[in-house]
From Swiss-Prot:
Keywords for the protein's UniProt record, in alphabetical order: ATP-binding, Cell inner membrane, Cell membrane, Membrane, Nucleotide-binding, Plasmid, Translocase, Transport
Superkingdom as given in the UniProt entry: Bacteria
MF annotations from Gene Ontology: ATP binding; ATP hydrolysis activity
Cysteine pairs bridged by disulfides in the record: none
Enzyme class, broadest EC rank: translocase
Name of protein: Hemin import ATP-binding protein HmuV
GO-annotated cellular components: plasma membrane
NCBIfam families: PRK13548.1 (NF010068)
Transmembrane intervals: none
EC nos: 7.6.2.-
Taxonomic source organism: Cupriavidus metallidurans (strain ATCC 43123 / DSM 2839 / NBRC 102507 / CH34)
Taxon lineage: Bacteria, Pseudomonadati, Pseudomonadota, Betaproteobacteria, Burkholderiales
The protein's role, per its UniProt record: Part of the ABC transporter complex HmuTUV involved in hemin import. Responsible for energy coupling to the transport system.
Assembly: The complex is composed of two ATP-binding proteins (HmuV), two transmembrane proteins (HmuU) and a solute-binding protein (HmuT).
Membrane topology reported for the UniProt record: Peripheral membrane protein
Amino acid sequence: MLIARNLSCSRGRRQILSGIDLTLPAGEMVGVLGANGAGKSTLLGTLAGELPGDDAAVSLCNRPLTDWPVDELARSRAVLPQSPGLGFDLGVTEVVAMGGYPFPEMGKHTLDTLLDRALALADVAHLATRSYQSLSGGEQQRVQFARALVQVLACRTADSYRALLLDEPISSLDPRHQLQLLGTARNLCHTDALAVLVVLHDVNLAARWCDRLVLLADGRTVASGTPADVLTPPNLATVYGIPATVMESPVHRGVPMVVFG
């Protein structure tokens, strides 16, 4: 399990995260919410081992994250950054196949099967013969999601812990693909026992798809728990600085729906 205990992080004299506690168990999807500059991406990057935080504040499978070699870490977690750049052009299938790089022992047939599954799950199979640079921003985002899926699904031993860390993965997607991506991530929590952490701005999508939410403000946890426990008018006003009305979704029973303003 990925665990943060009293995690703090600073850049120069600026404190970005302070005293964050978070657990990410297998089979659960956790959403991170907050206004711009709240520390959401820094939290995800620190949990991924890509940004420095307090030594030993983060552990993966009962081992400090700082003790994990990069190649071993890549076999246990996959990261979809907010702006996944690619400085050179490759075919879509080549980009998705990058997710298999941490697994050199994987045979071609196994990789091809995994590629087909990831391309279908991300709804980019029809783009497989295209060049990456020819795609729209939303299409590129889905291709990168497929790459992360290959990486996180490649390790399939019975006792393996696998975390999928997604930083604003729907920022360039149309409504259909937003629902599809989040639904895919949620389904994989259940079918493949993945642990998923996702940074989002849409509180209603977070409420619908996430098992738990973490609400941040100024690098601190304002609330953590179920969507119903976290998405309250006082919490939302504290974080976003505007009034909020919370009601039950008329479409999804038991799911809170937030209206701002």
